[in-house]
Swiss-Prot record:
Pathways involved: Protein modification; protein ubiquitination
UniProt superkingdom: Eukaryota
Organism: Homo sapiens (Human)
Gene: ANAPC10
Gene3D superfamilies associated with the record: Galactose-binding domain-like
InterPro entries, sorted: APC10/Doc1 (IPR016901), APC_su10/DOC_dom (IPR004939), Galactose-bd-like_sf (IPR008979)
Domain (DOC) ranges: 2-185
Modified residues (N-acetylthreonine): 2
PANTHER family: ANAPHASE-PROMOTING COMPLEX 10, ANAPHASE-PROMOTING COMPLEX SUBUNIT 10
Family to which this protein belongs: Belongs to the APC10 family.
Keywords carried by this UniProt record: Acetylation, Cell cycle, Cell division, Mitosis, Ubl conjugation pathway
Name by which UniProt lists this protein: Anaphase-promoting complex subunit 10
C-alpha cells in the first residue's frame, strides 16, 4: 500500500507541464469505462472542467481503461477527487495497473485516500525513478468512502517525460575559421 505524492492542496498538474519536463498524453489514448450513467462518461472525465465528473453505474470494482496504440512511456498519473462535493461517491481505495492488454495487467500502485480534495499525483515509476513503458493503464476503484456503491472521478491526466532534443546542444563556433562557414548564403 502506498500513499500518493504529497503535493500542496489543489496543486494543478498543469504546473508540471509549465516546467517543460512533462506533457499530457491522454488524448493519444483510447479510453473506456466499466460503466457510466448517461451524460457522465469519458467526455466529462477528460473535459478539463472540475465541475463535471464520471459516475459509475454498477458493482465494484469500477474501472477506467486507458489504451495506447503503441508502447508509451508514462511518468505520472493525476486524478482529481473532491470529498466535500462527492462524499460517499469519493474513492477511498484505488489500484493502478499496467500491462500490454487486459490479460496481463499487473498492479504497480495501490492507494488509500482519506477524504481527498484536489489533485492526487501518482508516480508511475519503478524503484529507480524510471518511468513505466506500457500499452495500457487501468485504474480500479476498489472502495469508496462511507461504503458508497458508485464512484465519481472528476478528471484524470497522464503525463510522459519530455525528451531533450539534441538541437541547440552543439558547441558554439569560436574560431575565425569556423565562423566563416557558420551560415549558408
Amino acid at each position: 500500500m502506498t500513499t500518493p505524492n504529497k503535493t500542496p492542496p489543489g496543486a494543478d498538474p498543469k504546473q508540471l507541464e509549465r516546467t517543460g519536463t512533462v506533457r499530457e498524453i491522454g488524448s493519444q489514448a483510447v479510453w473506456s469505462l466499466s460503466s457510466c450513467k448517461p451524460g457522465f462518461g469519458v467526455d466529462q472525465l477528460r473535459d478539463d472542467n472540475l465541475e463535471t465528473y464520471w459516475q459509475s453505474d454498477g458493482s465494484q470494482p469500477h474501472l477506467v481503461n486507458i489504451q495506447f496504440r503503441r508502447k508509451t512511456t508514462v511518468k505520472t498519473l493525476c486524478i482529481y477527487a473532491d470529498y466535500k462535493s462527492d462524499e460517499s461517491y469519493t474513492p477511498s481505495k484505488i489500484s493502478v495497473r499496467v500491462g500490454n492488454n487486459f490479460h496481463n495487467l499487473q498492479e504497480i500502485r495501490q492507494l488509500e485516500l482519506v477524504e481527498p480534495s484536489g489533485w492526487i499525483h501518482v508516480p508511475l515509476t519503478d524503484n529507480h525513478k524510471k518511468p513505466t513503458r506500457t500499452f495500457m493503464i487501468q485504474i480500479a476503484v476498489l472502495a469508496n468512502h462511507q461504503n458508497g456503491r458508485d464512484t465519481h472521478m472528476r478528471q484524470i491526466k497522464i503525463y510522459t517525460p519530455v525528451e531533450e532534443s539534441s538541437i541547440g546542444k552543439f558547441p558554439r563556433c569560436t574560431t575565425i575559421d569556423f565562423m566563416m562557414y557558420r551560415s549558408i548564403r
